[in-house]
Amino acid sequence: MPDSVDLSYAIGLKPAQAIEYFQSKGYTIGFNWHEVEVRAHATAFTVAGILRQDILQDVRAGLQDSLDNGLTLEQFRRQMTQKLTQKGWLADKAKLVADEDGVLEGKQLTPRRLRTIFETNMQSSYGAGRYAQQMENAADRPYWTRVAVMDLRTRPAHAALNGLTARYDDPIWQFAYPPDGWGCRCRVRARSQSDIDSKSISVWSSEGHLETVQQAWGPQDTREVQAFRYNGQLYTPDAGFGHNPGQGWLAGLGQRLMDRSVTAPPKMAALAVQHTLSEPQLLDAITSDMRRFVNQSLLREPAGAFRHAGALSTRTLDALASRGRMPDSAVLTVTDYAVVQSPGPLWELLPKQLRQPVAVAADGDDLLYVIRNGDALHQVRATPVDNAQGYALQLPDGGKSLTPASLQSLAELPLLEGSFDGL
């Protein structure tokens, strides 16, 4: 039988030391915690809602320090307040008018906003570990129960889901695995069949209860998102939190940041996406998620689902600006309609290849990317979307390899980035 542990001592340890401490007491860690820790660290600095490069770096450093050294919220906030005030990004709260999240005209931050960022991202970091552990143990504990804190801070919609129990492979966990909203403190408890039987717990299924709804997205836009009815009430995750987090926390956070980038100034969005996708763990997660999205899109009728694949580079934006064609949004998006029109393996390569294209040319308002797949070159067309929603990606000619004649035609277009020399 394992020895007793001193939780007051263990809670202040760094992750590696905490694991070693519990193992020394005879406890077996039933999941690959090294992998989970790496994912948690990668998750921690993918900060949604802060798209300015210098601030993103500061917040990343602060969150990393919090994970490494077990800093409290107050220590994190004090550290970030001093740093952001010095840079002129944090103003006197008494002199400003902020929205409910503390955001000031999209440019400045308040301590309340810092609290939201800290709690949401740390909760997501720990959620990555919980999810990995529960998936590895799904054969023994295949039933998941959603648990809310149930205090005065718990939102009624989240409190209403307290106790919801469904199988781990139920579709709702693809978009409603917590945290699924700003400030969400809910978690999931895994249960065995004997636990279900002994406690007479009812297992719910989302079959017949899933709906597609229009959700407000920014001040003047809406988008189709998934929702479900439970006990007669319709539940929808917060805007930006419905990107299949149950199958990839990092991919979900990456999609969330790019969602926010859609309405950000293009240069700011390009810097944020470029910086964030430089994290190998995140880029791999987004690539895997794109593969799943493509496979799922080919199994059903197109319904307007999409995945972001990246953003225009700052070099391309500068070239467009010099031509008087600065876009309203820099985000590049793959839709299920485009996948069905041109099925193939190229789609999953886009998150990586679009970051370092062979060349980018202008064709009117469209952009033509040339990317490499082994020894072959392929063309990707990016077409501006209405209402400043970035660019929709397509694979001309079904993604076939470019011929010498096709390359010659592309080389005659205005070059924005890269080179056609030697191709």
Task: Identify what each model region corresponds to.
Residues 1-181, 191-303, 347, 358-367, ...:
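Domain-core detector
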Residues 185-189:
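Extended alpha-helical oligomerization segments
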Residues 264-423:
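Ribonuclease/tRNase effector modules and their secretory precursors
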